[in-house]
Amino acid sequence: MERKNNYEIQAAQARALFCARDLDAVAREHGLRQEGQWLHLRLLGEPYRVSRRNGRIEREEDGRWLPADGFDETLTIFDLLCDAKPGRHAVGTWRTTLDFGGQVHRGLLENEKPDALELLYDKDPARLRAACEMLGGEALPGADVSYALPFFEDLRIAVQFWHGDEEFSPRLRFLWDAAADQYLRYETMYYALGLLRTRLQALG
C-alpha cells in the first residue's frame, strides 16, 4: 500500500507541474492539436489527450475516451511533453536502455528466469505479432519476432523476441533509437517500457 501511495503522490506532483507550465508553448513545441481543455498527442501509435485543467490523461479506444492515468503513462507523457530537448530528431540506429545509463540499472532489465510475457510469447508468438501490428509496428529483420513501433513524434522503439530452447530461455528485448535521450530521461525509459509491456499484453 505504501508503494502504491508513493506512486500516486509522484503522479499527482507530475500533473501539478505540468499544469503550471505554459501549455500553449508546450503545444507549439510538439505540434499538438488543441481542442478546448484538451491537448492531443499520439504515443505508441495510439491517440491520447491531456487535460489542461488538471493534467488528467485519456486514451481513445473503440471511439471512446477512457481514463489512462496509470503511473507509467503519466510519467512518460509528462516527461516527453515537458523535458524533450529542442531540435531533437531520431537517427535510425538502435541502442539498449542500459546504453543510456551506464549499466546503473542492469538488474532491473536482466532476469535469470523468463517472465510471464516471455513465456506467453514462447507458446504463442502470433500474439506478439498481432499486438505490434495493432500499435503500428513495422517488421524488422533479426530475432524470431522483431518490430519497430512508433513511440512519440519520430522516435521509434524496437521489440525483439527469441524463442527458448534446451540451452536458452525465451527472451523479449526492447531497443531505443540512439537519440532517445533527446526525448525523455534515462529514468523515464523504464516507465515507458512498463507502459509498452502493458499495452502489448492488453492487445496481444
Model segments located where?
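Amphipathic, interaction-prone secondary-structure segments
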Residues: A27-R53, E138-H163
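Intrinsically disordered, low-complexity regulatory segments enriched in Ser/Thr/Pro
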Residues: E46-L75, W162-E187
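Conserved binding-pocket/active-site segment within a compact domain
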Residues: D122-Q182
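Short Lys/Arg-enriched alpha/beta "domain-start" segment
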Residues: M1-L39, L43, C82-L135
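Ampiphathic alpha-helical segments that act as solvent-exposed interaction surfaces
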Residues: L66-V91, D177-G204
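Generic alpha-helical structural element
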Residues: L66, L117-L120, A148, R185
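Domain-length accessory/inserted modules outside core catalytic folds
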Residues: V104-K113, L117, P141-A143, D181-L184, ...
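Charge-rich alpha-helical segments
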Residues: M1-A12, A16, G36, N54, ...
